[in-house]
């Protein structure tokens, strides 16, 4: 058995049953919520608020949800909830008794939900398979999205994050890793966004924004030159978190082990892990306190990306000039 495989298995919490290779065929994948995340009071509060919201919404239809994990999988409650929220009628069976009919019903419902939320199927954090297989994380992502769309004033606990353990069966055995997923936004960022120089900057003429972007691109490329990397687009090239982590490592003298991040992220979840790690590093160093949602970076939000890079530019550009010329905050 290889040492890397042993290392990976040691990272799996004892409360999570380790699947055997017989249970998980070659190439198969499973994921689990970490026990600590399940016991997190904010995670429990999120489920409670969502259940109360569903039960209140469906009270006239005498439908009661007792467990989001167990009661949502067959599409019955989701069918009634979405029809009520969206004020429309879906042409599906009221009660589906077989697995095939339940999956078909879920497919029709989720297609309508995704269309209403303007989310492409491949970008959605839920699917027919995950909902049908009682994936609590996927179910919560779906319900949070519906709540934000149809009842934005619902008092969801802010900044709910969970640690997810991924298990994959490879040719050398079982491999595991951990990722952090964001379920709800930072409340101060969502409800009371702080006004700073970048809020004002983006109200100015496009050429002003472009000038700031060019200055920061030049700074970034100068620092990444020794790695043989270059950046042309701030909006897109920082979305997966890789260049951001490498830049922070160069500027702050961090050494990041390859086990800590994804060098070639292949999914939004892996990109989110990288960006979350980068923001945590910046906060730990006292470089950044503005409440940025990691998902905004992954979704290529120009203002959020520029705000983060400017915090590095402001510190290290001044240091390089020995305190000479002063770089004013963009406004």
Curated annotation (Swiss-Prot):
Pfam families: CH. GO terms for molecular function: actin binding. GO terms for biological process: actin cytoskeleton organization; cell adhesion. It comes from the Eukaryota. GO terms for cellular component: cytoplasm; cytoskeleton; focal adhesion; plasma membrane. SUPFAM superfamilies: Calponin-homology domain, CH-domain. Residues 44-151, 210-317 form the Calponin-homology (CH) domain. It is a peripheral membrane protein. Coiled coil: none annotated. Keywords: Acetylation, Actin-binding, Cell adhesion, Cell junction, Cell membrane, Cytoplasm, Cytoskeleton, Membrane, Repeat. PROSITE patterns: CH. InterPro entries: CH_dom, CH_dom_sf, Parvin. Residues 18-38 are annotated as: Disordered. It is found in: Cell junction, Focal adhesion; Cell membrane; Cytoplasm, Cytoskeleton. The keyword Aminoacyl-tRNA synthetase does not apply. Interacts with ILK; the interaction promotes the establishment of cell polarity required for leukocyte migration. Interacts with ARHGEF6; the guanine nucleotide exchange factor activity of ARHGEF6 is essential for the PARVG-induced enhancement of cell spreading. Plays a role with ILK in promoting the cell adhesion and spreading of leukocytes. Belongs to the parvin family. This is Gamma-parvin.
